[in-house]
Amino acid sequence: MRDSSQNTLLNILILYIVFERLFYKFAGPIRYKNIFCVPVQETKLPIAVANYLVYQSLMSLTREWQKYSGLNLAPLRQFGTVEYRHMQGHRDIKYLLTWINLLFRLHKYAKKHEFILLFNNIQTLNTTSAYEEFVKSVFKEDAHHLLTNTLQPDMESGVST
């Protein structure tokens, strides 16, 4: 993340919030209620993101960020990295590689798009209901790992946040 632009970081944040429930479902339901992996949508962090959009202070955003949220931005200050806390200890290599590929695809998509265009596209999702198409555009051939029968309500909550 050290070499990433603020545009990329913002894109990662909004994409993460949109897909957060899908990530938790992939990682396993036990993680959703874990106090060391609190969903961003269940905190006041989306307000911090909105404030960042207004005031453009990355330092204040990372300072306000909660360490035990599912996506932890606090390491940005010291290490130039972000931390995804969803994945519990696991021995299934294929499962872990799938998780890594999902995150890689999210980051790759975030780097390719301008924030304002992505933001506008996300804002229309609850109107167009193009959730599955959006998942497929971001995660490509790995999208099937996130497509569930509750895709619409899971993504609606992220889009509305």
Regions found by a protein language model. Give the residues of each.
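C-terminal accessory/tail domains of diverse enzymes
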Residues: D3-T161
